[in-house]
Amino acid sequence: HGTYTPGTATYSQMDYMLKVAGFGNFHVGTIEGYPTFETMLAQLKAAKAKSVTLVPFMFVAGDHAKNDIAGEWREMLEKEGYTVHVRMEGLGQIPEIQKIFVDHIRFGLKHRTQGIMEKKAVYAAGEKNE
């Protein structure tokens, strides 16, 4: 999906990390923010790609995935001459991602949240005991 907030930087970082890891045929584009559709399209052209598989990088492949990715993006890429395939599966359908979420929930249930003021008090108390 993307965002117009500074958090958009994570998407270009993901694109960079994929390429550094050897996945040069993966390109990240966002509906809102950066990298834009045009940025991704330029990468596809530079790579001389003939076909594209669009995969939503969202937990649930809902309306945005259907309307924007499987709809508008698919149409725009087809107009550019690409053969386009769409994999309408959200990240939440992937067992490994489900496991990460369950592990985080279990961790949260076992450990209580500690506020910054409480942490500072612990640090201050530790310094006094030295």
Please place each PLM-identified region on the residue numbering:
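Extended amphipathic ligand-handling, pore-lining, and cofactor/metal-binding catalytic surfaces
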Residues: 1-130
